[in-house]
A protein has these predicted regions:
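Short loop/turn segments that flank or connect secondary-structure elements
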Residues: 1-209
Length: 209
């Protein structure tokens, strides 16, 4: 589902750079009339606009094992592939709901006395966030230990995405606090104080593999 019109427009703009050589469903997306708009979007059961579903999957997903004359693309999201081809960040070509993973941005209303505040919360996408069926999404879920193998902390490797979600000023403060936290972990490990090292359960599971 698109976040807003700007999200859909960005995706549409990126799709215009795709070629039949790299995109399995290039033909499916062609406009019905010359000069018309690419047919990459549709409405869901709630009337919200989203990327089209073709053959039980996203129109931008090149299926594994697909072969055709002239097709030189690879399995996976073709919007991600075009970002790599053109030297862009995938957050500039993919819909918000796709590039934000494994980060999760939610909005809450909190009451303090007689006042209400809108709060933006940046967290992780774990299985529980999906509700029913969440266990089926472990392939990109932070609850899966297979995802905890990066050489950098998420706040470093996902700097660009976090800056888009929360702004550069807020990110700078986040990075400062996380730097302090990471140094504390290193100091505690050097002093052999494991009880003072609090890490993500999936990270600990990954370290034991």
């Amino acid at each position: 589902m698109y976040t807003d019109e700007a999200d859909e427009e960005r995706t549409l703009k990126a799709a215009a750079y795709l070629t039949p050589e790299m995109w399995q469903f290039y033909g499916e997306a062609r406009p019905k009339k010359p000069g018309g708009q690419l047919r990459i979007s549709e409405k869901d059961e709630d009337g919200e606009r989203k990327t089209r579903r073709v053959e039980d999957g996203c129109i931008f997903l090149n299926r594994k094992g697909y072969e055709a004359e002239g097709f030189t693309g690879t399995f996976g999201c073709v919007l991600h592939h075009v970002a790599q081809r053109d030297g862009k960040h995938f957050a500039d070509t993919k819909p918000d709901v796709c590039w934000q993973l494994p980060l999760r941005r939610s909005f809450e209303t909190r009451e303090y006395g007689e006042r209400e505040y809108s709060v933006t919360v940046i967290g992780e996408y774990e299985r529980l966030a999906w509700g029913d069926g969440g266990d089926d999404f472990d392939w990109y879920c932070t609850s899966n230990s297979d995802a905890h193998v990066g050489t950098e902390p998420v706040y470093v490797s996902n700097k660009y995405e976090l800056e888009l979600l929360m702004g550069k000023e807020a990110y700078a403060e986040l990075a400062r606090l996380c730097d302090v936290r990471m140094q504390h972990i290193r100091d505690s490990a050097a002093r052999n104080l494991p009880l003072f090292i609090i890490q993500h359960p999936a990270t600990l599971a990954a370290q034991k593999k």
